[in-house]
Amino acid sequence: MEKNREIISKNNINVEVFLIRSLIGKLNKKVKVLKALGLNKIGDKKVHFLNQSIKGMLNETINMILLSEVSNV
């Protein structure tokens, strides 16, 4: 299984974002980024097309998420 940083370095792929850490006690900026990604509570999953704006959002919250590459969506 690839690590988060290896997946973020790729371009134009679909990634599944999985929230693995709680939002409680986190900086308000990080909470807003995660909610913009569609992740509200632990265990939420969303599929996003990996472009520059999504990469920035994922880099901001890299320690709270788990990424996996999705082939067909």
UniProtKB/Swiss-Prot annotation:
Part of the 50S ribosomal subunit. This is Large ribosomal subunit protein uL30. The gene is rpmD. InterPro entries: Ribo_uL30_ferredoxin-like_sf, Ribosomal_uL30_bac-type, Ribosomal_uL30_ferredoxin-like. GO terms for biological process: translation. One of its GO terms (molecular function) is structural constituent of ribosome. It comes from Borreliella afzelii (strain PKo) (Borrelia afzelii). Keywords: Ribonucleoprotein, Ribosomal protein. It holds the Pfam family Ribosomal_L30. Belongs to the universal ribosomal protein uL30 family. GO terms for cellular component: large ribosomal subunit. The keyword Transmembrane helix does not apply.
